[in-house]
Amino acid sequence: MNLSKGDKVIQLSFHGESSGHALVSKLSREYNIDISIIYGNIEMLDGKPLGKLVTIFSGSHNDIEKALASIGENNVKAEVMYDAQ
């Protein structure tokens, strides 16, 4: 994996209805960032979808921070796994 300065590796955790939203494309459009998906998995738990995506967020520091702040509003958990400062 080749990261540029400022890129962040982010794990997104989805559950229930949040797994059906087009979050990645929405964040990319609204915050002018590129999001690359490097891993994804979805399972059913008690009949409800539960999933994880490992992504790379690329763009300006401010745009990435704004995108991360908005993720919680979509009932999705974001964890910064690596920050290529």
Regions found by a protein language model. Name each.
Residues M1-K52, I56-Q85:
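Long, contiguous binding/interaction regions
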